[in-house]
């Protein structure tokens, strides 16, 4: 079949675009089986069916098109948009991840010079930005599953590549979340396996810093996860409660406010151990964290997360107190302050939260009471302002209403009566009024005559 041309669609291809808009996967599958349908056909704007499906957020449709060989990096759009850019604009995290796994390039720019991550950030789809920025191709990890050079064995067993890749690509950098991911996979939760994993992470970190296009963000992330793995090894070797003990150490809060001091110190120590002191990112992190006292904002975790994942602080979202997962929607039933993503996280955190739960409850109730008082005060103030406005309006209406004198002047009969009175006065005292001059010259003569008459009267 000849390569597709922009705007040259067969009737079946036009039907396919319509079916994609409706989300009918079965009908789309039937049309894709037709010899008259090219999976990468282009509409008049240069959009492929995959771009249409990604922009409309059709997950199953995207999966179907990729199975049929859709080109995830097709760049025929009139403004240079790719399928990954449309996925980011749609805000669909699953489709964004799907495009990346299918091999979508993240550094391609459109006609205005923006990458997919920048376009997603521009429209406020910060979750998609985080996914794109944290994506790590599986092929780069599979490289270490094969013997290289003089090595007789690979640095990373094949069975560990999948679980390790899942942790590397996670967008949640909370240390408890990383330990939970290790704990849930029996293959990883062993000393030998973790040792191999953190050595590979150190190699990736070194490669990121020494390659031509240096990637400090990815290097810092690999180093951070490596530090968490090394602590896991320590607890597996030295503690009877093993990883559960590590999680408790990370969550244990100090008595006065429940702040997890050990967790904060661990993250600060991990950043400080970054082996490339000249890195700009390291210097920025140190400047942001060093002046902050333990227990104050910003925490080391929040600063590190923003630097690595690109998550912004002004986004309104609730995070789980235990594992840091975004979108927590369950509150402690007593204090109504602490958030969790599920009951397991609440149970895990209860051993330390119970010490400060009542205190937090009192603080919360006090804040609610003050908020209610402030609300009532604002309502009273608003009512008072409205009453003053109404009173001012009534006063202005009274002032603008015509009085009894104005009514008298408005009566034409009174005007006539006044004119008659004036005529009578003029008849009785003709000397009292000077004649109205017709010209300036006559006016001056008349004034002179009056003045002369007054002088004569005074002499007599």
Swiss-Prot record:
Q: Which SMART domains match?
A: ANK
Q: Where in the cell is it found?
A: Cell projection, Cilium
Show me the ANK repeat boundaries.
45-74, 79-108, 159-188
Q: Which residues bind Zn(2+) 1?
A: 320, 323, 341, 345
Report keywords, A-Z: ANK repeat, Cell projection, Cilium, Metal-binding, Repeat, Zinc, Zinc-finger
The GO cellular component terms are: cilium
What does this protein's UniProt record list under function?
May be involved in the trafficking of signaling proteins to the cilia.
In its UniProt record, a GO molecular function of this protein is: zinc ion binding
| Chief subcellular location | other
Name by which UniProt lists this protein: Ankyrin repeat and MYND domain-containing protein 2
Region of interest (Disordered), residue spans = 371-460
Gene encoding the protein: ANKMY2
- One Pfam entry for this protein is Ank_2
Instruction: Map the zinc fingers (MYND-type) to residue ranges.
Output: 320-357
From the UniProt record, list the coiled-coil ranges: none
| Binding-site residues for Zn(2+) 2, renumbered to this chain | 332, 335, 353, 357
Comp. bias regions, Basic and acidic residues: 371-387, 425-436
Superkingdom, natural source? Eukaryota
């Amino acid at each position: 079949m000849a390569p597709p041309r922009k705007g040259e669609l067969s009737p079946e291809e036009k039907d396919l675009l319509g079916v994609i808009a409706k989300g009918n996967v079965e009908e789309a599958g039937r049309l894709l089986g037709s010899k008259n349908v090219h999976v990468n056909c282009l509409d008049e704007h240069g959009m492929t069916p995959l771009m249409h499906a990604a922009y409309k957020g059709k997950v199953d449709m995207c999966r179907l098109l990729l199975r049929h060989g859709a080109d995830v990096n097709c760049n025929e759009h009139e403004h240079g948009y790719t399928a990954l850019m449309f996925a980011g604009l749609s805000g669909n995290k699953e489709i964004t991840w799907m495009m990346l796994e299918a091999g979508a390039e993240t550094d391609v720019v459109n006609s205005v010079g923006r990458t997919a991550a920048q376009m997603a950030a521009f429209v406020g789809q910060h979750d998609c930005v985080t996914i794109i920025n944290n994506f790590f191709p599986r092929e780069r990890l599979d490289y270490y599953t094969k013997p290289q050079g003089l090595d007789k064995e690979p640095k990373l067993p094949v069975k560990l590549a999948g679980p390790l890749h899942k942790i590397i690509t996670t967008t949640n950098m909370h240390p408890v979340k990383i330990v939970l991911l290790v704990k849930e996979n029996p293959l990883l939760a062993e000393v030998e396996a973790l040792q191999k994993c953190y050595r590979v992470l150190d190699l990736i970190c070194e490669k990121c810093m020494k390659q031509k296009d240096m990637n400090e963000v990815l290097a810092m992330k690999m180093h951070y996860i490596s530090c968490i793995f090394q602590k896991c090894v320590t607890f597996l070797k030295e503690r009877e409660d093993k990883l559960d003990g590590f999680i408790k150490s990370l969550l244990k809060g100090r008595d006065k406010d429940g702040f997890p001091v050990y967790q904060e110190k661990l993250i600060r120590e991990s950043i400080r151990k970054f082996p490339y002191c000249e890195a700009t990112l390291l210097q920025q992190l140190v400047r942001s964290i060093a002046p902050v006292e333990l227990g104050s904002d910003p925490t080391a975790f929040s600063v590190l997360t923003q630097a690595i994942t690109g998550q912004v602080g002004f986004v309104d979202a609730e995070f789980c107190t235990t594992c840091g997962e975004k979108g927590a929607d369950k509150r402690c039933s007593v204090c109504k302050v602490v958030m969790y993503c599920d009951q397991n996280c609440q149970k895990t955190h209860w051993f330390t939260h119970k010490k400060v739960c009542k205190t937090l409850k009192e603080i919360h109730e006090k804040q609610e009471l003050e908020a209610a008082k402030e609300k009532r005060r604002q309502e009273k103030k608003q009512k008072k302002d409205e009453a003053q406005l109404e009173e001012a309006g009534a006063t202005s209406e009274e002032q603008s209403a015509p009085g009894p004198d104005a009514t008298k002047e408005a009566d034409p009969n009174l005007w006539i009566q006044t004119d008659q009175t004036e005529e009578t006065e003029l008849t009785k005292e003709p000397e009292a009024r000077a004649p109205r001059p017709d010209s300036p010259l006559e006016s001056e003569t008349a004034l002179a005559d009056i003045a002369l008459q007054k002088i004569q009267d005074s002499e007599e």
